């Protein structure tokens, strides 16, 4: 069984269009076990009962940004080992450095191509 058949991914973005585009790309890669939500708090709640291998999260979201969510993931025993990819339109060095300090596994700058997303995922979880 291929990794793409086993991997579980959560997509977190306040923009439904972005969630849809990422989910479509994942589907094109053969990844079908995908959950999505529009904000960090609901993602954290969902992860308590439905763990995933990887979270792909937008940085700029109301209420709780992607780095705040990453901090919560890394300080919770149940989620500290979950892979994390940050997607941001602001790939400034301070954001990326803070993400690395918190345990971010990889990041993508918007806009990105589907193959860039695939390479980013494979760098975190292995070849799809």
PLM region descriptions:
Residues 51-53, 78-83:
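His-Asp phosphorelay/catalytic-motif detector in bacterial-type signaling
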Residues 61:
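Receiver (REC) domain active-site loop signature in two-component systems and cognate sites
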Residues 23, 36-54:
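Acidic, metal-coordinating helix/loop segments flanking the phosphotransfer/catalytic sites
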